[in-house]
């Protein structure tokens, strides 16, 4: 299983991709159940569900309602455990406890990040026997993480990141003890990885997938090579098109941490571009709880329009004081170096169509526009591209 507040779909897609392209024998043709579709060469899109002939099932484990605690995985991957879905869990302590419960059901190894405070809190609460069969991957050193409780540390060397190549490159350092467990010899391994998808958050996702594949029996080199051919999960930094020098990208990010990681990746991929964001909040409860965090994350962009909230399972009447302006108001206390000429960098426009047209009118060649959110904001990429084309015809 692959669980976590963020990165589940990308990591489970990556693991499935690695097994499809590098798995042999019983690992070949895995089954997978993923909460999204997978981008394939030539613009093709693969369905997120597949019943394969192999012996492995890769399952994205959604934590939103606690149902992932019913799973009994052989390997449990936890990409992070930053608090979310507090409408269900009530508080961070119960949210963390659910991940501890999920990890405890793994019959084999647990693979989790050490770069996330929530995941580290989970590690500290694991049963000692579970902690000892946990693999922690991180850009941090052991002393920065704290007591590993017998877990094995796999370091990600981020010094080899490259913005100029258009790929995210890094090295995964696998200690000899883990290499031996995976049947890969008794020496330390240094695996160079080059991803087509940007951002250090994706370097972590890829590392988790590579480690899980190694534990299943894929050779380290083959796993790393397969990861390098992965084009991404749909709606994860997905290119929608380019019109008159303006690039439009779509992303599913709907939590402050995801948005922050997305915009960090955007700055790496487009270091000299103006970054504009059309953001649709998802859930009134999440907007209310994380309004300031949303504002801080969005401040990494140059220009932001927040649209009306996508309600999903909630009703506006239950949250009469929550709207797009909740985030805009919270942003008034957030410093911003790239404010527009009138001194503002963020505004609220409830109507998505109007907001998309407004953002398109502001664009200049080399700008990059992101449509961001878990709702129907994804449809606005085409609207923006059409508006850009019409403006220059």
Regions found by a protein language model. Name each.
Residues 26, 100, 128-133, 179-184, ...:
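ATP-dependent carboxylate-amine ligase
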Residues 1-133, 207, 214:
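Phosphate-binding loop of NTP-binding sites
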Residues 33-36, 128-164, 195-200, 224-228, ...:
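Beta-strand->loop->alpha-helix junctions that form or flank phosphate-binding loops
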Residues 5, 35, 113-114, 139, ...:
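Cofactor-binding loop segments of dinucleotide-utilizing enzymes, especially the Rossmann-like FAD-
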Residues 37, 64, 83, 117, ...:
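Residue-level marker for beta-strand->alpha-helix junctions and adjacent short loops that shape enzyme
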Residues 40-42, 116-122, 142-146, 285-286, ...:
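Short, charged/polar "capping" segments at the starts of alpha-helices
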Residues 162-189:
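Acidic-glycine-rich active-site phosphate/pyrophosphate-binding loop
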């Amino acid at each position: 299983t692959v669980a976590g507040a963020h990165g589940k779909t990308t990591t489970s897609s990556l693991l499935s991709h690695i097994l499809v392209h590098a798995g042999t024998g019983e690992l070949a043709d895995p089954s997978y159940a993923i909460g999204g579709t997978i981008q394939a060469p030539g613009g093709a899109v693969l369905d997120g569900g597949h019943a394969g002939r192999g012996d492995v099932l890769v399952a994205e484990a959604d934590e939103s309602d606690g149902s992932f605690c019913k799973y009994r995985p052989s390997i449990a991957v936890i990409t992070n455990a930053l608090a979310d879905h507090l409408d269900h869990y009530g508080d961070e302590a119960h949210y963390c406890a659910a991940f501890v419960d999920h990890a405890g059901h793994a019959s084999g190894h647990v693979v989790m990040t050490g770069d996330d405070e929530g995941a580290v809190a989970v590690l500290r609460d694991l049963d000692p026997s579970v902690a000892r069969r946990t693999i922690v991957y991180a850009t941090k050193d052991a002393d920065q993480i704290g007591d590993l409780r017998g877990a094995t540390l796999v370091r990600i060397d981020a010094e080899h990141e490259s913005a100029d190549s258009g790929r995210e490159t890094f090295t995964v350092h696998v200690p000899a003890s883990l290499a031996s467990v995976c049947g890969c010899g008794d020496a330390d391994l240094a695996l160079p990885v080059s991803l087509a998808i940007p951002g250090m958050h994706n370097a972590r996702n890829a590392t988790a997938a590579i480690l899980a594949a190694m534990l299943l029996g894929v050779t380290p080199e083959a796993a790393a090579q397969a990861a390098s051919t992965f084009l991404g999960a749909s709606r994860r930094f997905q290119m929608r098109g380019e019109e008159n020098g303006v690039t439009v990208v779509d992303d599913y990010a709907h939590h402050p941490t995801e948005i922050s990681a997305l915009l960090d990746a955007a700055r790496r991929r487009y270091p000299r571009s103006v970054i504009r964001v059309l953001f649709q909040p998802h859930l009134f409860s999440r907007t209310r709880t994380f309004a300031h965090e949303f504002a801080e994350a969005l401040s990494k962009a140059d220009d932001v329009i927040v649209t009306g909230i996508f309600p999903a399972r909630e009703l506006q009447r239950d949250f009469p004081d929550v709207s797009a302006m909740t985030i805009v108001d919270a942003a008034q206390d957030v410093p911003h170096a790239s404010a527009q000429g009138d001194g503002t960098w963020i505004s609220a426009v409830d109507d998505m169509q109007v907001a998309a047209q407004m953002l398109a009118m502001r664009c200049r060649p080399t700008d990059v526009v992101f449509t961001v959110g878990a709702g129907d904001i994804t449809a606005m990429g085409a609207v923006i591209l059409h508006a850009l084309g019409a403006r220059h015809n």
